């Protein structure tokens, strides 16, 4: 019935209502008419799309067209309006600025964005590149930028700005790199932008003064290019190295360019012969692959000449060969093909597919004895691996885009960042190294060094610097394993801890279960990994602090007992905390540690404690008396006490003058004071001339020292200033059992320290021995006795 109704409807004459809907309900009368209708609709859709694309192209600034063209190849669905907007903002903000070359400043961020587009970076990164100098060099605020372009762009620009604000230089370099690594952890695109920024600056470096060119080139060669290498950005790394080489060694660069150009014809012929043989054999083996030349870069050639001591004529591998396959299994098959053609060189095969270098780079490397007996380097990898090798971490965003298009994650994408063990290692170092200089030293070492791969007994791979030992291995596994390491077995055999490890060895370490187990100081002589060095240094620094803490407590106890003072009452938590705050130490433990390390004397701390308790005058006198070598009880001084007698007047009170501090052996004279006593002076005293004007008051005095006599002595110490100098001199005097009454130190502009000490001693004959002891202190070049007035 329904079918009849439909048929009737189809042939019935149209009503008024149906006529109004006729275009939508009309059924074609034949297949030909159906096809015509479909073609017409398709043409209308294409026309609309063409008009829309033409309109979009017409709104794109012509300056951006090269950037857009490159970016669209990888990101066909990219939102170009935000790129246009970012360019307009950057152009407006930099409108009044020029580069050193005289070009408008906007050419720089545009060039950086183009470099990043060629690397395959995402739209957000290109937007940040266009804006990366606006916050630093214009009045555009980070808040305004974030509000207009989003939080992600804001984070990237902020990261690049913070790196730019600290110059890579001798003082700040370590801290700058530390900030750079921290920024990488937050978002590695910050460093990718920075590397691209440096690449364009290196390309235009000729417009800067020569000294600035050299400084930037050294920074690039030592830090930026190796970092680009570790991030897998090989193409950028090579260009940075060659540009730096041309600036730092222009004549050597030009000579190598000339030598390479001179070998070009024979090199091209040789390469064509090699490629033909490989292609024919691969085809016969039914392996689908592309074979291409791989030119050596000038800096690489120079390094071989310098590091390996070769002449240019001995460097045969000016051109290597790269084989690009579709599948990993084809890579290993291609190695077999190459080895069947030419004899492989022993020890020159590297499998970076199974063990990726730096967690990013994958390839098979082999060197064979090629045609004419010349060494030939061959790299074999998949096309995906090649993209990663060329662009490194930047390729991660290509994979992200691939996922966005088809919903399937590329096998490399999930692990691209997470597998960068080297980056995680850097983050560990930057947290552990308290000193930025120490961190930079570790970083530079690791950037320059080659690596080996060893295995745990469970088959886990541990990457170590070449020359590493079982101790380096232990610290790479875990800090506590390193601290407690007492032995090792390599490939099932016991070995010494300083034995160097080789590629592919299985390493097992034995650890101590003793609670006080720790590293040996001897390990510092043979470990090579930055992690092991840092951990061992930290362990001994902590141990020294603990020893200094106990030493400081013992020194305080001895000083208090020497003064006959109540230890528990004097050295209590509250009073010690007050003194620690007064002396600007964090807590009581820090104060004890400072005492143990000699930064502050126990006697000084005791004096501060006494002052806190309000009894400083009386207690200090008692402390000074009991700390002298004399064992006799204190009593009022008589003529015998000062060691001077007055002929014919045995009961007269005598006193040693403080202006010249005479001691037995000095030529002396007496001066009758208005109180009836006698003041004893050296005859060469600075006051002697004025005293002798009153000749009637000058009398004869003689030395008559007794075992209880105590004399004041002043000495001057001249030394080259250094850390803990005063502490070492004071300790030398204390070892001679003298009681220091006063000390003063001045340091001149040429770092010469002049110290003056006044102390009591019982036997002046001992003075020569004391002066020799002070002369033996490191840095002291003169010490002699002086008068107080001198």
Curated annotation (Swiss-Prot):
The keyword Kinase applies. GO terms for cellular component: plasma membrane. Pathway: Purine metabolism; ppGpp biosynthesis; ppGpp from GTP: step 1/2. Gene3D superfamilies: 3.10.20.30, 3.30.70.260, Beta Polymerase, domain 2, Hypothetical protein af1432. It holds the Pfam family RelA_SpoT. It catalyses: GTP + ATP = guanosine 3'-diphosphate 5'-triphosphate + AMP. CDD domains: ACT_RelA-SpoT, HDc, NT_Rel-Spo_like, TGS_RSH. Its EC number is 2.7.6.5. InterPro entries: ACT-like_dom_sf, ACT_dom, Beta-grasp_dom_sf, HD/PDEase_dom, HD_domain, NT_sf, RelA/Spo_fam, RelA/SpoT_AH_RIS. Residues 1-37, 620-644 are annotated as: Disordered. Residues 714-788 form the ACT domain. It is an enzyme of class 2 (transferase). In eubacteria ppGpp (guanosine 3'-diphosphate 5'-diphosphate) is a mediator of the stringent response that coordinates a variety of cellular activities in response to changes in nutritional abundance. This enzyme catalyzes the formation of pppGpp which is then hydrolyzed to form ppGpp. Belongs to the RelA/SpoT family. This is Probable GTP pyrophosphokinase. It comes from Mycobacterium bovis (strain ATCC BAA-935 / AF2122/97).
């Amino acid at each position: 019935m329904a079918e009849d109704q439909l048929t009737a409807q189809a042939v019935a004459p149209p009503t008024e209502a149906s006529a109004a809907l006729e275009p939508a309900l009309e059924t074609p009368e034949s297949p030909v008419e159906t096809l015509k209708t479909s073609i017409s609709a398709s043409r209308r859709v294409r026309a609309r799309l063409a008009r829309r694309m033409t309109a979009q192209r017409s709104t794109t600034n012509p300056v951006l067209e090269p950037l857009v063209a490159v970016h669209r190849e990888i990101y066909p669905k990219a939102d170009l309006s935000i790129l246009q907007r970012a360019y307009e903002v950057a152009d407006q903000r930099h409108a009044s600025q020029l580069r050193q070359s005289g070009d408008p400043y906007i050419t720089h961020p545009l060039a950086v964005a183009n470099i990043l587009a060629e690397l395959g970076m995402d739209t957000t990164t290109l937007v940040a590149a266009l804006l990366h100098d606006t916050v630093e060099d214009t009045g555009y605020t980070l808040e305004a930028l974030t509000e207009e372009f989003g939080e992600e762009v804001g984070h990237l620009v902020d990261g690049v700005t913070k790196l730019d604000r600290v110059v890579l230089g001798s003082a700040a370099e370590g801290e700058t790199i530390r900030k750079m690594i921290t920024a990488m952890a937050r978002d590695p695109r910050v460093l990718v932008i920075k590397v691209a920024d440096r690449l364009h600056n290196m390309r235009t470096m000729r417009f800067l003064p020569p000294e600035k060119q050299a400084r930037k080139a050294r920074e690039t060669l030592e830090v930026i290019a190796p970092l680009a290498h570790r991030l897998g950005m090989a193409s950028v790394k090579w260009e940075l190295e060659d540009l730096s080489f041309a600036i730092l060694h222009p004549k050597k660069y030009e000579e190598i360019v000339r030598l390479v150009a001179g070998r070009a014809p024979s090199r091209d012929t040789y390469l064509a012969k090699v490629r033909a043989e490989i292609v024919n054999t691969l085809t016969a083996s039914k392996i689908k692959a592309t074979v291409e030349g791989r030119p050596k870069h000038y800096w690489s050639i120079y390094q071989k000449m310098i590091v390996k001591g070769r002449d240019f004529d001995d460097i045969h591998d000016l051109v290597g060969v790269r084989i690009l396959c579709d599948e990993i299994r084809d890579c290993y098959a291609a190695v077999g093909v190459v080895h069947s053609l030419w004899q492989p060189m022993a020890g020159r095969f590297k499998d970076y597919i199974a063990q990726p270098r730096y967690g990013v780079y994958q390839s098979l490397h082999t060197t064979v004895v090629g045609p004419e007996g010349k060494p030939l380097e061959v790299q074999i990898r998949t096309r995906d691996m090649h993209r990663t090798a060329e662009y490194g971490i930047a390729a991660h965003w290509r994979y992200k885009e691939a996922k966005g298009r088809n919903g399937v994650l590329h096998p490399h994408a999930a692990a691209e960042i997470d597998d960068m063990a080297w980056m995680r290692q850097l983050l560990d170092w930057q947290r552990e190294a308290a000193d930025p200089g120490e961190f930079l030293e570790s970083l530079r070492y690791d950037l320059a060094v080659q690596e080996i791969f060893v295995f745990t007994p469970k088959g886990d791979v541990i990457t170590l610097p070449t020359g590493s030992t079982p101790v380096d291995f232990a610290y790479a596994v875990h800090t506590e394993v390193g601290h407690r390491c007492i032995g090792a077995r390599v490939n099932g055999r016991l070995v010494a801890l300083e034995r160097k490890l080789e590629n592919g060895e299985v390493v097992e370490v034995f650890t101590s279960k003793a609670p006080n187990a720790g590293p040996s100081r001897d390990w510092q002589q043979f470990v090579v990994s930055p992690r092991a060095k840092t951990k061992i240094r930290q362990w001994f620094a902590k141990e020294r602090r603990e020893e200094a803490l106990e030493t400081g407590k013992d020194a305080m106890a001895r000083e208090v007992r020497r003064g006959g003072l109540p230890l528990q009452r004097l050295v209590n938590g509250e009073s010690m905390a007050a003194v620690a705050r007064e002396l600007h130490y964090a807590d009581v433990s820090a104060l004890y540690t400072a005492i143990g390390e000699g930064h502050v004397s126990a006697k000084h701390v005791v004096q501060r404690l006494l002052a806190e308790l309000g009894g400083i005058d009386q207690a200090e006198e008692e402390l000074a008396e009991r700390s002298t070598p004399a064992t006799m009880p204190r009593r009022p001084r008589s003529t015998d006490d000062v060691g001077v007698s007055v002929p014919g007047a045995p009961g007269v009170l005598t006193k040693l003058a403080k202006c010249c501090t005479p001691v037995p052996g000095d030529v002396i004279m007496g001066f009758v004071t208005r109180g009836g006593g006698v003041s004893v002076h050296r005859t060469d005293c600075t006051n002697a001339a004025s005293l002798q004007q009153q000749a009637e008051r000058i009398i004869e005095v003689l030395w008559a020292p007794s075992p209880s006599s105590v004399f004041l002595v002043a000495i001057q110490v001249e030394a080259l200033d250094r850390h803990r100098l005063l502490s070492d001199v004071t300790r030398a005097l204390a070892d001679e059992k003298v009681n220091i009454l006063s000390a003063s130190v001045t340091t001149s502009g040429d770092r010469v320290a002049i110290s003056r000490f006044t102390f009591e001693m019982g036997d002046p004959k001992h003075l020569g021995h004391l002066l020799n002891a002070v002369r033996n202190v490191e840095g002291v070049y003169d010490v002699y006795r002086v008068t107080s007035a001198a």
